[in-house]
């Protein structure tokens, strides 16, 4: 368990550092791409260790959040790897996992899980709609791959930043507000970047 916690904190710190630098730096050039790879890889460590800890400790909240963040991290990475956005088998498996996870999160009626679960379901429906449009040979929105990349990777970063705040800030009331505050602040920034780079 100590090893898992060590991996979780180390990869979390690395992901948070890389993600924060990406947030403030010029987008799209080589340093961005390099740090983006670091963010993606370290997030794998964050999620894997979180899942191990959640299963060992029986912490369902942590498990649901880990799956939610992994979905965004993976989907944001895939949007860059295959700009056509055509889903393969693994993509569908991740979407299915995110859908089930989202439904379960909403069904808990925990305010934090309810919000993030609803968001997960919304993102899943967007993914399904994209695949339906592709099957009908309809043209996707301009720079759809970049829109998805920005949205999903910022979402994954929000998960990391939120965890950092929750671990390091004590006695914040109401507690659920601290969980949702980074989303409220960073989503408008995400929309700004999407408009700036995608039109």
Specify the residue positions occupied by each region the protein language model found:
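Alpha-helical membrane insertion/targeting regions
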Residues: 1-199
């Amino acid at each position: 368990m100590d090893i898992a916690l060590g991996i979780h904190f180390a990869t979390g710190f690395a992901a948070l550092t890389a993600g924060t630098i990406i947030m403030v730096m010029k987008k799209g050039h080589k340093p961005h791409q390099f740090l983006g790879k670091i963010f993606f890889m370290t997030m794998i460590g964050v999620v894997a260790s979180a899942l191990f800890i959640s299963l060992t400790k029986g912490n369902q909240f942590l498990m649901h959040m880990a799956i939610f963040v992994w979905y965004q991290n993976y989907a944001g990475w895939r949007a860059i790897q295959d700009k056509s956005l055509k889903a393969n088998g693994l993509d569908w498996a991740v979407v299915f996992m995110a859908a089930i996870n989202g439904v379960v999160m909403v069904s808990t009626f925990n305010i934090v899980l309810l919000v993030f679960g609803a968001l997960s379901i919304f993102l899943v429906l967007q993914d399904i709609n994209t695949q339906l449009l592709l099957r009908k040979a309809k043209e996707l929105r301009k720079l759809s791959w970049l829109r998805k990349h920005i949205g999903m990777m910022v979402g994954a970063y929000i998960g990391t930043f939120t965890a950092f705040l929750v671990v390091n800030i004590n006695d914040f009331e109401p507690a659920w507000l601290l969980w949702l505050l980074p989303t409220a602040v960073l989503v408008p920034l995400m929309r700004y970047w999407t408009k700036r780079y995608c039109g």
